[in-house]
């Protein structure tokens, strides 16, 4: 079973998270950040993961700490759930349309954390959610999961649609990269390690 749990309690947040790679797209998400709850639900469904999140934070200030710490916990749980990475495909990508928006995500589960993001969101907020937090979440996810993550929003006019396409593509790309390929013997690297 490729799964892991994480808990993180600080003066700013209290987060409990359980993640399973080989899931059924089941999400049980409770956060103080409604837009993030929605995005995590989409990510889980499109990645065919199982994800449980209970997150509370100092959202009276803003959504930054909660969003960032969810990214940290999810990245750590994803890395642990991958185990030794033997037999995984390692690479994954997805191109996802959402009405007028088109987003592309490519990932390498390489143990070399990096985020490259090209997205010009037309609005600074979706509801009360600061759209700059999408980058913050993705960077913490990439850093803690030790993945090389590339995100491109090719175009779009509706900020909600653009971000939604990103999270759907992220789920699909990570599903592909983490899937087991029976042809792969050991870790998928000519170095013999990742």
Curated annotation (Swiss-Prot):
Keywords: Amino-acid biosynthesis, Cytoplasm, Histidine biosynthesis, Lyase
Catalytic activity: D-erythro-1-(imidazol-4-yl)glycerol 3-phosphate = 3-(imidazol-4-yl)-2-oxopropyl phosphate + H2O
Domain of life of the organism encoding this protein: Bacteria
Example GO BP: L-histidine biosynthetic process
GO cellular component, one term: cytoplasm
EC number(s) per entry: 4.2.1.19
Pathway(s) of this molecule: Amino-acid biosynthesis; L-histidine biosynthesis; L-histidine from 5-phospho-alpha-D-ribose 1-diphosphate: step 6/9
Similarity section: Belongs to the imidazoleglycerol-phosphate dehydratase family.
Protein name (Swiss-Prot/TrEMBL): Imidazoleglycerol-phosphate dehydratase
């Amino acid at each position: 079973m490729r799964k892991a749990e994480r808990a993180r309690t600080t003066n700013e947040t209290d987060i409990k998270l359980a993640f399973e790679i080989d899931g059924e797209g089941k999400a049980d998400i409770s956060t103080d950040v409604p837009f993030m709850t929605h995005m995590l639900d989409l990510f889980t469904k499109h990645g065919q993961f199982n994800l449980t999140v209970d997150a509370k934070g100092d959202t009276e200030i803003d959504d930054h700490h909660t969003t960032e710490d969810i990214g940290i916990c999810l990245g750590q749980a994803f890395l642990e759930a991958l185990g030794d990475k033997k037999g995984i495909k390692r690479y994954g990508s997805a191109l996802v349309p959402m009405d007028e928006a088109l987003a592309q995500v490519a990932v390498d589960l390489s143990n070399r954390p990096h985020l490259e993001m090209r997205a010009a969101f037309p609005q600074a907020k979706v509801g009360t959610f600061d759209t700059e937090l999408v980058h913050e979440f993705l960077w913490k996810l990439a850093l803690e999961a030790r993945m090389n993550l590339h995100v491109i929003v090719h175009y779009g006019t509706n900020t909600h649609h653009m971000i939604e396409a990103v999270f759907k593509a992220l789920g699909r790309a990570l599903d592909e990269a983490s899937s087991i390929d029976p042809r792969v013997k050991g870790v998928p690297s000519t170095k013999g390690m990742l």
